[in-house]
A protein has these predicted regions:
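N-terminal assembly/interaction segments in proteins that build large macromolecular machines
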Residues: 2-330
């Protein structure tokens, strides 16, 4: 039977599939609209299955708030071209709208939702069939609290944040802190909120670095005292190449090797434990200042911390939780 352009357009409007795909589906279904939709749905599942091992690194992340609940989702695809497609963004928007309306608290609850009469997973699979790209709902998070502010970075859909304040009526301050979260990627609210394994790891690294710095200074001073430029002998490759260039003599190269070995050993044996501990504490404190939200320098006034900024507005104002999604490598 002949398939009309009106039928093709109707199927395309319902499925967002390409014109030729719609025509082929209607022809195969002998003009039956429901059967054609089922054919396209199965085709979408086949396309999605074939692309399941591909890397979906682009996409759309969105955050939204409704009262005392806020959520964010990450819908992934393969290319920036598809990520910016209006239909793809519309699908992500429908998903976040449904998530917030249902106030989901787990990915299982999200996957159980329906949009436009179909399961979210099926909606994503069908869209994958239309675009020919792998798609997946790769992230979900939520917060609850007294007052929540969402930030979607310049409506570009690759970065978003949620911030929970302990008091209502400070949306502008919340927006500023949400931008802080998006820009500075804190790992915790404050030092007390940093996971213990992270604290232990940072402390170990700081102690090791403090020891190496002190040993390095001792070796550098000994080299300078011997009339050797430390930069010329900071590695075995440099010693060999700089000897070949004539920048240091073979005798200086041998002397440098001897100094580096003996002085480093002596310096390590004579390290002062209390001094190393104090230096390490300073390094860890710097880590907290750079990575804990309330201790970070506020992006709009780096002379004060985020905590100080909030207290300058209201003495009791603080952040109780935050979340962040980004599609960019950091």
């Amino acid at each position: 039977m002949a398939i009309t352009i009106q039928e093709i357009n109707e199927l395309r409007k319902k499925t967002q599939a390409g014109l030729m795909d719609c025509k082929k589906a209607l022809t195969e279904a002998n003009g039956d609209m429901e059967a054609a939709m089922e054919i396209l749905r199965k085709k979408g599942q086949l396309v999605a299955a074939k692309r399941s091992d591909r890397d979906a690194a682009e996409g759309c992340v969105l955050a939204k708030v409704d009262g005392n609940y806020g959520a964010m989702i990450a819908l992934k695809c393969e290319t920036d071209f598809v990520a910016k497609n209006a239909d793809f963004v519309a699908l992500a928007t429908k998903i976040i709208d449904a998530v917030v309306a249902a106030k989901c608290k787990s990915m299982d609850e999200v996957n159980a939702l329906t949009i436009d009469g179909e399961n979210i997973k099926d909606a994503i699979t069908n869209r994958s069939g239309v675009t020919g790209e792998k798609m997946e709902l790769d992230g979900f998070n939520f917060v609850e609290g007294e007052d929540i502010v969402a930030y979607n970075h310049m409506n570009q859909n690759f970065l978003c944040a949620l911030v929970v304040l302990n008091k209502k009526g400070f949306e502008e301050a919340g927006k500023g802190v949400a931008m802080q979260v998006a820009a500075m990627s804190p790992i915790a609210l404050d030092a007390d909120s940093v996971p213990q394994d992270v604290k232990d790891s940072e402390t170990r690294n700081a102690v090791d670095k403090a020891k190496q710095n002190q040993i390095g200074k001792a070796v550098e001073n000994a080299l300078k005292k011997a009339g050797i430029n430390p930069a010329h002998v900071d590695s075995e490759d440099h010693i060999e190449s700089n000897t070949a260039k004539g920048w240091i003599t073979p005798e200086e190269a041998a002397k440098a090797r001897e100094i580096k070995a003996t002085v480093a050993k002596e310096a390590e044996a004579n390290l002062k434990e209390q001094m190393i501990e104090n230096i390490a504490k300073g390094m860890v404190a710097k880590f907290y200042k750079e990575n804990c939200l309330l201790e970070q320098a506020y992006i709009d006034d780096n002379k004060i911390s985020v905590a100080q900024y909030l207290k300058s507005i209201d003495k009791d104002l603080t952040v109780t939780d935050f979340k962040r999604f980004t599609l960019r490598a950091e």
